[in-house]
Structures are given as C-alpha cells and as structure tokens.
Amino acid sequence: MSDLTSPKVNKSDADWREQLTPEQYHILREHGTERPFTGPYWNSTEKGLYRCAACDEPLFLSDTKFDAGCGWPSYFEPVKPGAVTEHRDSTHGMVRTEIRCANCGGHLGHVFPDGPPPTGLRYCINGHSMVFEPV
C-alpha cells in the first residue's frame, strides 16, 4: 500500500468546496460513503469511461464493471496501472484497503479480494466520486 504517495493535484479546501457538489466534497475530500443503491452508476450498463469527479482523471472502463450486488459501482481493475493508490483504512472497527485517485488524492472507495476473474478484485466505488463519459 502506498500511504506515502503524494497526489499531483493540490488545491485548498476552499477551492475543492467551490468546485465540487456537497455530496462529491463529502466523499472525495472527507472520505465519506454514499448509502448503497443511492449513488449514480451503481446499476448503469452504458459503455464508456468513468473519470474522477474532482480532477477528470480516467479511473475505470465500463468493460471492467460488473454487478456485485452491493449497491455501489464495482470494477475488477482500474483503467491503467497507477490510476489509483491503495491506503490502509482501519476506521469503523475493521481493516480495509481504501482507494484514492492517484492524481488528486480524492477518496473513491475500497478494494476487496472477492471480485471476478481475471483479477479476483472488486473495486467498490462511490458513484458521486466519478463522472461518466459515454463512448
């Protein structure tokens, strides 16, 4: 895990608050979580690219999206190596692996080792942390 990785985009808290919606700010900057089955994209089957809502960096392709039944958009791999960073998360009485945008450090969600082939991983992502670009 890369807890010491510094994001490339650095903005003030005031700049983030001005740019992001309240939901996006809570998730991306305060490490919040949307309730399952309430955020955008959890049941979307459109083809396209999911980008970071904070910095527009490419994160996930629809070709890697699958229905995990958890209520959040789930993917088996990021769009490219290095698109996201992993961080130890020991909040809420459990240990998980948090996923952040490598470009701006925004909180995206968590990754779990219960996904489908070929990776066996499930990137469980808050829909409000992303914007969708159809192809």
UniProtKB/Swiss-Prot annotation:
Keywords (A to Z) from UniProt: Metal-binding, Oxidoreductase, Zinc
UniProt-annotated catalytic positions: C124
Domain MsrB stretches: 13-135
An example molecular function term from Gene Ontology annotations: peptide-methionine (R)-S-oxide reductase activity
Cofactor(s) this protein cannot do without: Zn(2+)
GO biological process: protein repair; response to oxidative stress
Positions of Zn(2+) binding: C52, C55, C101, C104
Cofactor notes: Binds 1 zinc ion per subunit. The zinc ion is important for the structural integrity of the protein.
Keyword field contains Oxidoreductase: yes
Catalytic reactions on record: L-methionyl-[protein] + [thioredoxin]-disulfide + H2O = L-methionyl-(R)-S-oxide-[protein] + [thioredoxin]-dithiol
A GO cellular-component term linked to this record: cytoplasm
InterPro entries: Met_Sox_Rdtase_MsrB, Met_Sox_Rdtase_MsrB_dom, Mss4-like_sf
Enzyme Commission number(s) of this protein: 1.8.4.12
Signal peptide: none
Family: Belongs to the MsrB Met sulfoxide reductase family.
Listed PANTHER family: METHIONINE SULFOXIDE REDUCTASE (PTHR10173), PEPTIDE-METHIONINE (R)-S-OXIDE REDUCTASE (PTHR10173:SF57)
HAMAP family registered for this protein in UniProt: MsrB
Name of the protein described by the UniProt record: Peptide methionine sulfoxide reductase MsrB
Organism: Agrobacterium fabrum (strain C58 / ATCC 33970) (Agrobacterium tumefaciens (strain C58))
Species classification: Bacteria, Pseudomonadati, Pseudomonadota, Alphaproteobacteria, Hyphomicrobiales
Name of the gene this protein is made from: msrB
